[in-house]
């Protein structure tokens, strides 16, 4: 029996508003526990929620960027459940009238494009955060009442790789809109995954398992890969799959049962009596639509069509708005686009990944990178020397020209000076000359290396190659 994998994702994104969705409490990350709460957040008797209009604007903006249809009439509902991090014993969410429906995004895996449907996008409030220790459990209510959007995909993904690509694309689009920073490490983006298997050709879905506590996109992919294997073994051996909630354990690289899954009826949804229905007219919709900036796909297409970048470069540069904006500012300052792209995708990304930092955390500026790239273009420094300048720029900042002067890194491009060095190297390496003349091309690389060593890497490489061949041919 051949089985087909069915995957759907539920993504919660914390909106970057200045206050919470139903109260004036601040939303700053990292504050002392229970210092950013109010009687509204904690559900004191007699208090009433007030809807944050900016949260609605942000939700609409995200929904539009995800190609959703925006509701004209929407409302809020109570999702009833008791848990220590939910002091009201209900969560204000949206049940049957979400703010956005029927959206989609396009992903690409192994060179093949695929459209993934988005069932709905709705607004809701976040719960508090529980911390469990050996001595007991603690609850921080700072997160209680934070504005969230939940984005529910269609079950259109067929592999864990497609799920990973969907999350990357979704995160990129949301970051471009500016409604959230989507930092998983700070909890502003969280993902639950639903996975089931069914015989190929069968229309009815199999029984699904929901995966929670997925702390990175990599964990989402790994958790789905393991669950895919687990369910396949169970079904092929004649067993059945229970509808349950599981978590991915990185230590064992397995999914572990948490609880038998509840259905939506268990939450006893009913309309929120303290909030009126919300009417969104065309004027409001168009005002929000006008605020949506250029999104990653459009920017990627522009980089290829107008700037002339290869498709791969355009893809990498537009994955995050931070990198894309940095690239644009560098090129606008006069740097060559392709050379800038090479540095950003090479040295810059390598440094950021190694140091686990973002561009905003380092001293490198678009103006600094632009000036360094222009020094390479003019032949003032070589690419090899530029790496020394780059290390200084990204660690300490400064003016590339001043760094070059202070460290004596100006490229040697005087033909007379280089010819003397080349002649001396050839005089001491007669065997390498013979090897080259006998067809051993590697000998030329050795000689170039000796010349670069003698000039401390400051010789102009193209000029060195030219003079070297001229001098060898004289002998």
Swiss-Prot record:
Its EC number is 6.3.5.-. It catalyses: L-glutamyl-tRNA(Gln) + L-glutamine + ATP + H2O = L-glutaminyl-tRNA(Gln) + L-glutamate + ADP + phosphate + H(+); L-aspartyl-tRNA(Asn) + L-glutamine + ATP + H2O = L-asparaginyl-tRNA(Asn) + L-glutamate + ADP + phosphate + 2 H(+). It comes from the Bacteria. GO terms for biological process: glutaminyl-tRNAGln biosynthesis via transamidation; translation. Pfam families: GatB_N (PF02934), GatB_Yqey (PF02637). It is an enzyme of class 6 (ligase). Keywords: ATP-binding, Ligase, Nucleotide-binding, Protein biosynthesis. GO terms for molecular function: asparaginyl-tRNA synthase (glutamine-hydrolyzing) activity; ATP binding; glutaminyl-tRNA synthase (glutamine-hydrolyzing) activity. NCBIfam families: gatB, PRK05477.1-1, PRK05477.1-2, PRK05477.1-4. Belongs to the GatB/GatE family. GatB subfamily. Heterotrimer of A, B and C subunits. Allows the formation of correctly charged Asn-tRNA(Asn) or Gln-tRNA(Gln) through the transamidation of misacylated Asp-tRNA(Asn) or Glu-tRNA(Gln) in organisms which lack either or both of asparaginyl-tRNA or glutaminyl-tRNA synthetases. The reaction takes place in the presence of glutamine and ATP through an activated phospho-Asp-tRNA(Asn) or phospho-Glu-tRNA(Gln). This is Aspartyl/glutamyl-tRNA(Asn/Gln) amidotransferase subunit B. It comes from Bacillus cereus (strain G9842). The gene is gatB.
């Amino acid at each position: 029996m051949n089985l087909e994998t069915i995957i759907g994702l539920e993504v919660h994104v914390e909106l970057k508003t200045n206050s919470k969705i139903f109260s004036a409490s601040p939303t700053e990350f990292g504050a002392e526990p229970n210092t950013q709460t109010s009687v509204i957040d904690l559900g004191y008797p007699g208090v009433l929620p007030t809807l944050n209009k900016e949260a609605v604007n942000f939700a609409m903006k995200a929904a539009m960027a995800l190609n959703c249809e925006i509701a004209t009439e929407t409302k809020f509902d109570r999702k009833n459940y008791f848990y220590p991090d939910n002091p009201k014993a209900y969560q204000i969410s949206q049940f049957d009238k979400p703010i956005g429906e029927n959206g989609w995004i396009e992903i690409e895996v192994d060179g093949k494009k695929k459209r993934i449907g988005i069932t709905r996008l709705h607004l809701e409030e976040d719960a508090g955060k529980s911390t469990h220790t050996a001595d007991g459990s603690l609850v921080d209510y700072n997160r209680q009442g934070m504005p969230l959007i939940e984005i529910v995909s269609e079950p259109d993904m067929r592999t864990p790789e497609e799920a990973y690509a969907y999350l990357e694309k979704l995160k990129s689009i949301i970051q471009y809109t500016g409604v959230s920073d989507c930092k998983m490490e700070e909890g502003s983006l969280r993902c639950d995954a639903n996975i089931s298997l069914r015989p190929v050709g069968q229309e009815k879905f199999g029984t699904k398992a929901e995966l929670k506590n997925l702390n990175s996109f990599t964990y989402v992919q790994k958790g789905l890969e393991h669950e895919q294997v687990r369910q396949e073994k169970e079904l092929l051996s004649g067993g059945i799959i229970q509808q349950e909630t599981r978590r991915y354990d990185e230590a064992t690289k397995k999914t572990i049962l948490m609880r038998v899954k509840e259905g939506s009826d268990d939450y006893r949804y009913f309309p929120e009596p303290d909030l009126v229905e919300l009417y969104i007219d065309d004027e409001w919709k168009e005002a929000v639509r006008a605020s949506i900036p250029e999104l990653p796909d459009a920017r990627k297409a522009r980089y290829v069509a107008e700037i002339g970048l290869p498709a791969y470069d355009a893809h990498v540069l537009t994955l995050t708005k931070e990198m894309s904006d940095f690239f644009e500012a560098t090129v606008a300052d006069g740097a060559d686009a392709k050379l800038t792209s090479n540095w950003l995708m090479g040295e810059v990304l390598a440094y950021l990944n190694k140091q686990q930092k973002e561009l905003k955390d380092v001293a490198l500026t678009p103006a600094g990178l632009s000036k360094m790239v222009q020094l390479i273009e003019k032949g003032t420094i070589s690419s090899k020397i530029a790496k020394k300048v780059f290390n200084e720029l990204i660690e300490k900042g400064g003016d590339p020209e001043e760094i070059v002067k202070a460290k004596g890194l100006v490229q040697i491009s005087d033909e007379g000076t280089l010819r003397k060095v080349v002649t001396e190297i050839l005089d001491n390496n007669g065997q390498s000359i013979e090897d080259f003349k006998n067809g051993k091309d590697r000998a030329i690389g050795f000689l170039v290396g000796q010349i670069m060593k003698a000039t401390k890497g400051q010789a102009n490489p193209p000029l060195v190659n030219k003079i070297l061949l001229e001098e060898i041919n004289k002998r």
